[in-house]
Regions:
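Class I S-adenosyl-L-methionine-dependent methyltransferase catalytic core
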Residues: 1-95, 99-207
Length: 207
């Protein structure tokens, strides 16, 4: 059977009942997923604008300063991981298939490192192993993916590390930035504590 909900609310449907979760979460600033699958979503009667507001990692958000998406993505994925660990049985396994790198205005950010740091920092998961794979896209470019295997450790771990992790990645990115790009990164760091997660999408908001 299929159950539809915001990923950050998964535990409300599947609490402590799952042995294995395999998923490929969104990446920072890559697609607007609701647009890529718009035709299907409209056939099913979903409200596209409500879905768009809650989408994780969307490049549509924060158009005035896209580096704020790095922070919002980290917060959203922290909430998602906190929900998924509560879905898993003790020692259950979570496998994340992650596009290794995203670019925001030409500045690279490691999706894999951000997610792994969030997963391990709050004590919810232990890393089991990581693998990598590569494929050639239609433009002839090599695309690397990391396969991160995590074991559920603590369903009640406190998840409060995402802001600090985002801050460190943004600070590190300044070494590759200049001009207005560097200015936007610096501005994001200065307001980082005021950036909120994406709004949760309730079941009522889907249709």
């Amino acid at each position: 059977s299929a159950r539809l909900c915001d990923a950050r609310l998964s535990h409300e449907r599947l609490s402590d009942s799952i042995d294995l979760i395999i998923t490929s979460p969104p990446y920072i600033n890559v697609f607007n997923y609701h647009q890529n699958y718009r035709a299907i979503m409209e056939v099913l009667g979903f409200d596209i604008l409500k879905v768009a507001a809650s989408e994780i990692g969307s490049n549509r958000k924060n158009r005035g300063n896209r580096f704020k998406t790095v922070v919002q993505y980290s917060l959203d994925m922290e909430e998602t991981l906190a929900s998924l660990v509560r879905c898993l049985k003790n020692n259950g396994i979570l496998i994340l298939i992650v596009g290794r790198e995203s670019n925001v205005r030409g500045i690279p950010f490691s999706n894999s490192r951000i997610l792994l740091e969030i997963a391990e920092s709050n004590g919810a998961f232990d890393k089991v192993v990581t693998h990598e794979r590569v494929f050639i896209n239609r433009f002839g470019k090599s695309i690397w993916e990391d396969i991160i295997v995590l074991k559920a450790k603590n369903q009640f771990a406190q998840c409060r590390a995402a802001r600090d992790i985002a801050r460190e990645h943004l600070k590190a990115s300044l070494s590759s930035a200049s001009g207005d790009v560097a200015d936007d990164i610096t501005e994001t760091i200065s307001v980082l504590d005021n950036i909120s997660p994406s709004p949760l999408l309730s079941k009522k908001g889907l249709i």
